[in-house]
């Protein structure tokens, strides 16, 4: 493996091998990360990286596209079958690119949008002032109820009536509960707004029937193709007949040039994998593991935003521990447990410190771990957060983590990916 790269650029080869070792020997609990199958990685590392293919299948600006046309058409058909939509655009390079394409297709600069507050679990591309969405549009925000930690739909409706937005965004990057897309469509219809569902985090759960689908409620749906969907890093737009033409044009030539055909091939493979029965079993186990891990963390005396989880992630409110999210992240890193610092609702700390950490189960579930392993992981996390400066203890836990991980290989070490 990597023999050509090692001969050409040994520095890069060494760094890749060290990263592979990190993934192999540690627990990946970042909610947005996962492991692709070997099949997806092979598609991405193929000769398709050499091919330009501006346009859509059958309507390219370059010759020699007969094979990449077939690949992209398969990706489109599989995406539509997986999510139950009539149209899909598989070309966005990322979830952010998918959102940019939707905004530029459906909005004019200065139009009003209503999105979820970033510190309440939203995403940068839903109106953050440091992002294009916050610079180009008139943004207002909704959030979660201070007592329950769950979306306050009554407040959302009140704000929508007051500002009459052109677009309401649903979906989040750090929200552990079910999103009521039907209720959000009712609110959107009441004020004459369009509804966009960004399901980047929950796409795999939606595809497997483990989270209510926005199809039939949202006017347009965006997602990434990694995270719970377990594909390559990329974006996807799903839509009906009403907006297909303008959304396709907004991707190309509106916001992108040539598509990444090697990534689209990886998407097609991942969509095919997600259509198999074992993917439904995998998605169900993600949620079972998340519930077990959440219960284990609370048994350690830790506080979870909203008191638990309905999906693949949970937010730990660290204020009772005296640690910031950044401090907790560093301590857990030393114990070979990877999480990310994350804001909690109305967080008093700045974004680079935060008062919370976000934890998710997609990656450890891909490795085949189940509820007993979640109980052990919760115990390790509790111990690290109680003794974050005890280097000997952290080193011991890192060794125990490595021992556990040897029994649950990552896909690169497998002949076949576990379900």
Swiss-Prot record:
Its cofactor is pyridoxal 5'-phosphate. It is found in: Cytoplasm. (6S)-5,6,7,8-tetrahydrofolate binds at residues 118, 122-124. Its EC number is 2.1.2.1. PROSITE patterns: SHMT. Keywords: Amino-acid biosynthesis, Cytoplasm, One-carbon metabolism, Pyridoxal phosphate, Transferase. The modification N6-(pyridoxal phosphate)lysine is found at residue 227. CDD domains: SHMT (cd00378). Its main location: cytoplasm. It catalyses: (6R)-5,10-methylene-5,6,7,8-tetrahydrofolate + glycine + H2O = (6S)-5,6,7,8-tetrahydrofolate + L-serine. Homodimer. Catalyzes the reversible interconversion of serine and glycine with tetrahydrofolate (THF) serving as the one-carbon carrier. This reaction serves as the major source of one-carbon groups required for the biosynthesis of purines, thymidylate, methionine, and other important biomolecules. Also exhibits THF-independent aldolase activity toward beta-hydroxyamino acids, producing glycine and aldehydes, via a retro-aldol mechanism. This is Serine hydroxymethyltransferase. It comes from Chloroflexus aurantiacus (strain ATCC 29364 / DSM 637 / Y-400-fl). The gene is glyA.
């Amino acid at each position: 493996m990597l023999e050509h790269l090692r001969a050409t650029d040994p520095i890069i080869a060494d760094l890749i091998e060290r990263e592979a070792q990190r993934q192999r020997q540690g627990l990946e609990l970042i909610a947005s990360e996962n492991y692709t199958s070997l099949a997806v990685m092979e598609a991405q590392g193929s000769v398709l990286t050499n091919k330009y293919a501006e346009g859509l299948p059958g309507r390219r600006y370059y010759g020699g596209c007969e094979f990449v046309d077939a690949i992209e058409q398969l990706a489109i058909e599989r995406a539509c079958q997986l999510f139950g939509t009539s149209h899909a655009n598989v070309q966005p390079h990322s979830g952010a690119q998918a959102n940019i394409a939707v905004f530029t297709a459906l909005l004019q600069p200065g139009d009003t949008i209503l999105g979820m507050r970033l510190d309440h679990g939203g995403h940068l591309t839903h109106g953050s002032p440091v992002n294009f969405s916050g610079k180009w549009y008139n943004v207002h925000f909704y959030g979660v109820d201070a007592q329950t930690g769950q979306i306050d739909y009554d407040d959302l409706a009140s704000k929508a009536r007051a500002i009459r937005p052109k677009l309401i965004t649903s979906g989040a990057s750090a929200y552990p509960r079910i999103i009521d897309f039907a209720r959000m469509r009712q609110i959107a219809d009441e004020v004459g707004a369009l509804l966009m569902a960004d399901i980047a985090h929950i796409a795999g759960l939606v595809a497997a029937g483990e989270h209510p689908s926005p199809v039939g409620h949202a006017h347009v749906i965006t997602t990434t193709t990694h995270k719970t969907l377990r594909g390559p890093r990329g974006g996807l737009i799903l839509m009906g007949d009403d907006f297909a033409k303008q959304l396709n044009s907004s991707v190309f030539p509106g916001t992108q040039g040539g598509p990444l055909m090697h990534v689209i091939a990886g998407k097609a493979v991942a969509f095919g994998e997600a259509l198999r029965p074992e993917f439904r079993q995998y998605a169900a186990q993600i949620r079972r593991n998340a519930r077990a891990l959440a219960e284990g963390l609370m048994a350690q005396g830790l506080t979870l935003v909203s008191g638990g989880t309905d999906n693949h992630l949970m937010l730990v409110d660290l204020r009772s521990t005296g640690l910031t999210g950044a401090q907790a992240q560093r301590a857990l890193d030393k114990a070979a447990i990877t999480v990310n610092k994350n804001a909690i609702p109305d967080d008093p700390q700045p974004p680079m410190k935060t008062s919370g950490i976000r934890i998710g189960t997609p990656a450890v579930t891909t490795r085949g771990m189940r509820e007993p392993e979640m109980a052990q992981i919760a115990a390790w996390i509790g111990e690290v957060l109680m003794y974050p400066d005890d280097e000997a203890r952290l080193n011991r836990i890192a060794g125990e983590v490595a021992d556990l991980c040897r029994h649950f290989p990552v896909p690169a070490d497998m002949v076949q990916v576990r379900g």
